[in-house]
């Protein structure tokens, strides 16, 4: 999953698994991406001998519903694995082989948003990525609206046409539907940052009771007085640099 940060761990030579991927292939495959995790598992002998293909949980659900024996991925899910070329709609097999991963694990990639099969006569399309599905389901005017989503992490997403230039990090370009793309800014800590503060306060008070209501009341009081905390919410690092940590100032 996106919260699996094992690929950020440091190996004996002082480099992380993701840094090895970058050095050997030129690709930035961030911790939590499918092939970053697969690379870690492969290097540490954790890939089951009976494993056949790589896919996301949504793709597996489609397989179970339709009875298909091979995963068929929408470009939005394929891109979340890493080593995916959006322009060609294919994975870079050569890059995978450079880090010792078998291209046989690659799933099939769909063109567009086709029906993958049927569940009791009901058509089942390929699964969309969670960011793309959330955008599709919540934004009314895709050409003019932004989607702001705060959960454990946080995301800001904007829909652009296929010819829109690829941005630089920390913005990502992600495949969407009908040939369009999403520009996405993601933080690993959204609501998790508030949960971390609540956990700290609870531990300090040595109580098992949640402290969110008290924190909310203190926040309202601080807004009125102007004595607010300044928080850098990178407590779990960033996708680009997992070693960065957060801070709470003006305590």
What are the roles of these predicted feature ranges?
Residues 98-105:
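A structural motif corresponding to the C-terminal end of an alpha-helix
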Residues 4:
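Carbohydrate-associated surface elements
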Residues 8, 12-31, 36-71, 82-93, ...:
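Active-site core segments that coordinate phosphate-bearing ligands/cofactors
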Residues 55, 72-78, 106-108:
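Conserved alpha/beta enzyme-core scaffolds, especially Rossmann-like or related mixed alpha/beta domains
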Residues 108-115:
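Gly/charged, well-structured mid-domain segments that form the phosphate/adenylate-handling core
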Residues 77-80, 117-119:
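Active-site-proximal beta-alpha loop/turn segments in soluble metabolic enzymes
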């Amino acid at each position: 999953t996106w919260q699996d940060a094992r690929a950020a761990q440091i190996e004996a030579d002082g480099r992380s698994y993701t840094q090895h991927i970058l050095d050997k292939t030129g690709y930035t495959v961030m911790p939590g991406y499918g092939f970053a995790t697969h690379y870690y598992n492969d290097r540490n002998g954790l890939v089951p001998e009976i494993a056949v293909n790589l896919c996301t949980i949504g793709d597996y659900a489609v397989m179970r519903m339709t009875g298909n024996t091979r995963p068929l991925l929408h470009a939005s899910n394929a891109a979340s694995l890493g080593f995916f070329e959006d322009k060609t709609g294919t994975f870079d097999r050569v890059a995978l082989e450079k880090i010792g991963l078998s291209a046989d694990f690659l799933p099939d990639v769909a063109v567009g948003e086709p029906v993958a099969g049927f569940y009791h006569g009901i058509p089942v399309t390929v699964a969309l990525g969670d960011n793309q599905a959330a955008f599709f389901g919540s934004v009314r005017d895709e050409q003019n609206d932004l989607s702001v989503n705060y959960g454990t992490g946080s995301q800001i997403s904007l829909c652009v046409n296929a010819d829109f230039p690829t941005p630089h990090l920390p913005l990502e370009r992600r495949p969407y539907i009908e040939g369009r793309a999403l520009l996405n800014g993601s933080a690993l800590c959204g609501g998790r940052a508030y949960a971390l503060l609540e956990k700290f306060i609870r531990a300090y008070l040595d109580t098992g009771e949640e402290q969110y209501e008290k924190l909310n009341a203190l926040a309202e009081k601080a807004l009125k007085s102007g004595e607010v905390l300044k928080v850098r919410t990178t407590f779990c690092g960033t996708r680009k640099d997992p070693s960065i940590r957060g801070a709470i100032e003006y305590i």
